[in-house]
Curated annotation (Swiss-Prot):
Keywords: Amidation, Cleavage on pair of basic residues, Disulfide bond, Secreted, Signal, Toxin. Its main location: secreted. GO terms for cellular component: extracellular region. Residues 13-48 form a propeptide. Disulfide bonds: none annotated. This is Conopeptide Vt3.2. Belongs to the conotoxin M superfamily. Expressed by the venom duct. It comes from Conus planorbis (Planorbis cone). It comes from the Eukaryota. The modification Serine amide is found at residue 64.
Length: 65
């Protein structure tokens, strides 16, 4: 599948709208969105919690059995 190179080129004459300019218009309390930190998961997914008969292997707790 081939495309002409003209379709892939950017037009340098058009100004690019920057997000930083748009962010300055917002309320300072609404500038940042809360993103929770992903937690590490072991080979058993979210089973790695200290509930039930679990055995410690390094930094994780695996089901004993």
């Amino acid at each position: 599948l081939l495309f002409p190179l003209a379709t892939l080129q950017l037009n340098a004459d058009q100004p690019v709208e920057r997000n930083a300019e748009n962010i300055q218009d917002l309320n300072p309390d609404k500038r940042f969105i809360f993103m929770p930190v992903p937690r590490r998961r072991g080979p058993y997914g979210s089973v790695h919690r200290r509930r039930g008969p679990y055995r410690r292997h390094g930094n994780c707790f695996c089901p004993s059995g």
